[in-house]
Design a protein with these regions (language model features):
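Membrane-proximal intracellular helices of multi-pass ion channels
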Residues: 1-442
């Protein structure tokens, strides 16, 4: 990193880091050793799978269990882990372990990678993140292991590890294809409380963000001492779990027993915000339910987490900005704090970028493939939100449509602002201010 810092910005290093890992993963997945047919996998399909894994999405063109060998599955799991932790986080951790001095540029890069407010305590925070990730994934695997081992014997150990990492990293990849049928996700365990609860908790913990973890561990139940961002994340996350779950409970899964209905409703309200697992056949959900899931997929998780999407805080800032207009206030306000105008402008830019890419991707795929617009918009939202839920059209798409989804997944993981800052730089000073004028809106 010392050589690169003289030529590249921190945003460019983040961008190139993800791109490099994706290309390496694609190369490994093309090899005959990765495929159960022992034949070369086409580069576009290997690139799609690698991008989906590194960008912790979960959209696939092949069933993970039936197409990929154990070598291929290990490659995919490592790509998921790298993508979830972040390339920069891993690089900084290795540097610390090797005893290298961590300079200001490296700390700045890490700050941008995890959306931290400043570079203070970055090395300590990195250690906290790494330890936390492996501890939580280990606990998740140990909890699920007895269930999987009862069903699959010794193979259940691998099932527990794979699904724990995939759930925590909000990836949504599964290896159930050889047991319950291709592309079935974890529908076989829709009524199994241990698997359901564990995966839901892993998704939530992975999706709330590393800075929120730090506040929870440091301040415990003293919520008043949490960062403003942590308070907003927890409030919005709770709302986005409870409200959709109520809708699913009353309007989508009325034919299920009450216990199964509660689990299924909660699971389907949690998983669209970038996880990608499903316990029901998604094609059986109404159009209203599908569009609700599209909204959840676009919102995604929280800053500095393993999740993608435009982020919970972005939506909170936009809503608070709108309410400030309704109430004739000068500034947006959240949890008794004023939100500066720069944050509101940034949130607006992120919202426009995600919505534009989502609409462009969905409409273009629909036009090219001659498929229903709802299915294509669902797939586009799943890609740009790095979710992985699908109505089953991804394996049938042509090369151009796959490339659109690949670019959408990459955009969704690294973030729109990272791409813009990598290309054009950040915080450029405005030389002169133009005259102010008014434009009628609304």
């Amino acid at each position: 990193m010392g050589i690169l810092k003289r030529k590249l910005t921190s945003f460019q290093i983040i961008l190139l880091g993800f791109a490099g890992v994706i290309l390496l993963g694609a190369f490994l997945l093309t090899l005959p050793i990765s495929s159960k047919t022992h034949e070369w996998t086409s580069f576009i399909d290997a690139l799609f799978t690698s991008t989906s894994a590194v960008c912790v999405t979960g959209l696939i063109v092949f069933d993970t269990a039936t197409h990929w060998t154990i070598f291929g599955q290990i490659v995919i799991l490592l790509l998921i882990q790298i993508g979830g932790m972040g390339v920069v986080t891993i690089a900084l951790s290795l540097a610390v372990i090797s005893g290298k001095k961590i300079g200001l540029f490296s700390r700045e890069t890490m700050k941008n990678a995890i959306s931290a407010p400043n570079v203070s305590g970055m090395v300590r925070l990195t250690g906290f993140i790494i330890k936390g990730i492996f501890l939580i994934e280990l606990i998740g695997a140990l909890v699920m292991m007895p269930v999987f081992c009862i069903d699959y014997g010794a193979e259940g150990v691998w099932f527990a590890i794979f699904h724990s990492v995939s759930a925590f990293c909000n990836a949504g990849f599964d290896i159930m294809g050889t047991k319950s049928g291709e592309f079935t996700s974890i529908t076989h365990y829709s009524a199994q409380p241990i698997i359901n609860i564990t995966i839901m908790l892993l998704i939530i913990i992975g999706g709330i963000g590393f800075l929120v973890w730090e506040d929870i561990c440091k301040h415990k139940w003293r919520i008043r001492e949490y960062r403003t961002q942590s308070k907003v994340v927890l409030i919005v996350t709770a709302a986005l779990i409870v409200l959709p779950a109520i809708y699913f409970f009353f309007f989508e899964f009325g034919d299920l027993p009450v216990g199964d209905r509660i689990f299924t409703s909660l699971f389907q309200s949690i998983t669209p915000r970038t996880a990608g697992f499903n316990t029901v056949n998604l094609t059986a959900i109404s159009d209203t339910g599908l569009y609700l899931m599209i909204i959840l997929m676009l919102i995604g998780g929280s800053p500095g987490s393993t999740a993608g999407g435009m982020k919970t805080t972005t939506v909170a800032v936009l809503f608070s900005s709108a309410f400030s207009v309704f109430r004739k206030k000068d500034n947006a306000e959240l949890v008794k704090r004023r939100i500066d105008d720069e944050t509101v402008k940034t949130a607006s830019a992120i919202f426009i970028m995600y919505i534009s890419l989502f609409l462009f991707g969905g409409m273009t795929i629909s036009a090219i493939e001659k498929l229903p617009i709802t299915s294509c918009l669902y797939e586009a939202a799943s890609a740009v939100g790095t979710v992985g839920l699908t109505l089953g059209i991804t394996p049938t798409l042509g090369i151009v449509s796959k490339l659109i989804l690949i670019l959408s997944m990459f955009f969704g993981r690294v973030g729109g602002l990272t791409l813009i800052y990598a290309a054009f730089g950040a915080n450029k000073k405005q030389v002169a201010k133009l005259p102010t004028d008014t434009i009628a809106v609304g």
